[in-house]
Amino acid sequence: MKARKSQRKAGSKPNLIQSKLQVNNGSKSNKIVKCDKCEMSYSSTSIEDRAIHEKYHTLQLHGRKWSPNWGSIVYTERNHSRTVHLSRSTGTITPLNSSPLKKSSPSITHQEEKIVYVRPDKSNGEVRAMTEIMTLVNNELNAPHDENVIWNSTTEEKGKAFVYIRNDRAVGIIIIENLYGGNGKTSSRGRWMVYDSRRLVQNVYPDFKIGISRIWVCRTARKLGIATKLIDVARENIVYGEVIPRYQVAWSQPTDSGGKLASKYNGIMHKSGKLLLPVYI
């Protein structure tokens, strides 16, 4: 998801990470290539560029390595026949109706999966790992690097970060922002956006409780329902003892792919025939 203040135009290509190219005193030209899988452009004659590409390529396609000790578990799945959720309010484990993964896919059979909440008060590697992932996400979306204050503050809870872990790799993330005002009431940041024109409806300020600041899934794990599962688990764990309804979730000016997800998740059809998306600014 794009940050709410970003000026990125819809459909624009993301800025790709690239180091300073080595000219080698002009005696050797640099051959710029573009990876067809991660879409990064880099110099094939630069050792530094190749190293940066290898790291970026792995993160984009397969996510980041994640220690089993990082994060507080809020959702676990041990196999594809049973999905469970750990309730923070009751401490009990209850089955969920559906798995986010396709049982027919042989490449994901018998994989341990979980969703964790990133604890900002921890000085270990989980905060650094999350920050590294967000650098990748923001570069891909060409978005400002200003969302970390939402989830990593130890003095004021402005929101939370959740990470989807598969076989000790972070393959998806979501940053949720609280839209409550200082008096506990919802703020006036909510808007309706017309899906096809991306135009905001004027003089209408709906109440939304939480906003999706960022949502991202690595390339090899997309179209498996992971993004939807992240939103569902976040709704159940962002506010202690409360499940936020779908209609009170807003999006931070969604990208093209984010808009498609939003339209399916909680878009509403206006009497005019226009599809409206809940957004916030």
UniProtKB/Swiss-Prot annotation:
The entry's stated outcome for residue 211 to D is: Abolishes acetyltransferase activity; but not chromatid cohesion activity
ZnF (CCHH-type) intervals: 33-57
E.C. designation(s): 2.3.1.-
The record's region (Disordered) falls at: 86-105
State its location(s).
Answer: Nucleus
In this UniProt entry, the residues modified to N6-acetyllysine are: 223
How the protein is affected by changing residue 35 to Y?
A: In ctf7-109; loss of function
- Which cellular component terms (GO) are annotated to the entry? chromatin; cytoplasm; nuclear replication fork; nucleus
For molecular function, the Gene Ontology terms on record are: acetyltransferase activity; chromatin binding; protein-lysine-acetyltransferase activity; zinc ion binding
The record gives the effect of mutating residue 232 to G as: Abolishes acetyltransferase activity; but not chromatid cohesion activity
List all Low complexity biased stretches: 95-105
Q: How is it modified after translation?
A: Autoacetylates in vitro.
Using the UniProt record, give the first listed, main subcellular location.
Answer: nucleus
**A UniProt-annotated Pfam family:** zf-C2H2_3
Respond yes or no to whether keyword Ribonucleoprotein is given for this record. no
In the record, biological process GO terms are: chromatin looping; chromosome organization; DNA repair; DNA replication; double-strand break repair; establishment of meiotic sister chromatid cohesion; establishment of mitotic sister chromatid cohesion; mitotic chromosome condensation
Query: What residue intervals traverse the membrane?
Result: none
The reply to whether Metal-binding figures as a keyword in the UniProt entry is yes
To which protein family does this belong? Belongs to the acetyltransferase family. ECO subfamily.
Protein name in the entry: N-acetyltransferase ECO1
Name its species. Saccharomyces cerevisiae (strain ATCC 204508 / S288c)
Q: What is the name of the gene encoding this protein?
A: ECO1
